[in-house]
Amino acid sequence: MERYESLFAQLKERKEGAFVPFVTLGDPGIEQSLKIIDTLIEAGADALELGIPFSDPLADGPTIQNATLRAFAAGVTPAQCFEMLALIRQKHPTIPIGLLMYANLVFNKGIDEFYAQCEKVGVDSVLVADVPVEESAPFRQAALRHNVAPIFICPPNADDDLLRQIASYGRGYTYLLSRAGVTGAENRAALPLNHLVAKLKEYNAAPPLQGFGISAPDQVKAAIDAGAAGAISGSAIVKIIEQHINEPEKMLAALKVFVQPMKAATRS
């Protein structure tokens, strides 16, 4: 959890925002997935947002669903994902690692056991995509017991009550949703979210990172100009993996070429 605090403090000092890529663990196989994650970090990622493959990903558009199918095809299990997380943490001791996942995967383990395992391998935050704030108590309590930041999604139409709840319960960062709907690079991030950012700040929420539909450097810059602490990009990155599925080296080179200007756009 503290890794987010030190990251945001360092970025503030350097007058930079955070660039946070999302990928599915184990896509397209364990070995290449670990190389992908190393490449993202080398190219400038400030933190990681990682998915654990799940059979029914409601919030995900087709691009990320395909990533999940590729991981399943490679035989990747949640247990192997945790082994990968431990390896990533060993290799990269300071980078914040967040999980983006679904409640069933938490229930399968038992809520407390799941967060205990997160703590053990060095995961900093968990966003459970299909658990609304009002049902989040058992999740966030277990998270805090194990020093894992509970992350909440702030939708573009959030009312005042919801903003207060998100500010009060969330730690690490706040996931600021560019728009409603499912993930996907083809639907560009829409409206400026200045008013939400201002309210979240007023209520002392964890720093907002804008996600959903972030696929170009100008959108990263726009998110930061609107007051966000950074931006999360998933589908655009996963699409690069898909396009170079049979050319592992080209894939890594293309990921680097994508991430470098995205990170550069965070520097004012």
From Swiss-Prot:
Organism: Escherichia coli (strain K12)
Pathway membership: Amino-acid biosynthesis; L-tryptophan biosynthesis; L-tryptophan from chorismate: step 5/5
Catalytic reaction equation(s): (1S,2R)-1-C-(indol-3-yl)glycerol 3-phosphate + L-serine = D-glyceraldehyde 3-phosphate + L-tryptophan + H2O
Example GO biological process: L-tryptophan biosynthetic process
Molecular function via GO: lyase activity; molecular adaptor activity; tryptophan synthase activity
Quaternary structure note: Tetramer of two alpha and two beta chains.
Top-rank EC class of the record's enzyme: lyase
Name of the molecule in the record: Tryptophan synthase alpha chain
A matching Pfam family: Trp_syntA
EC number: 4.2.1.20
Purpose of the protein: The alpha subunit is responsible for the aldol cleavage of indoleglycerol phosphate to indole and glyceraldehyde 3-phosphate.
Active site: residue positions: 49, 60
Record keywords: Amino-acid biosynthesis, Aromatic amino acid biosynthesis, Lyase, Tryptophan biosynthesis
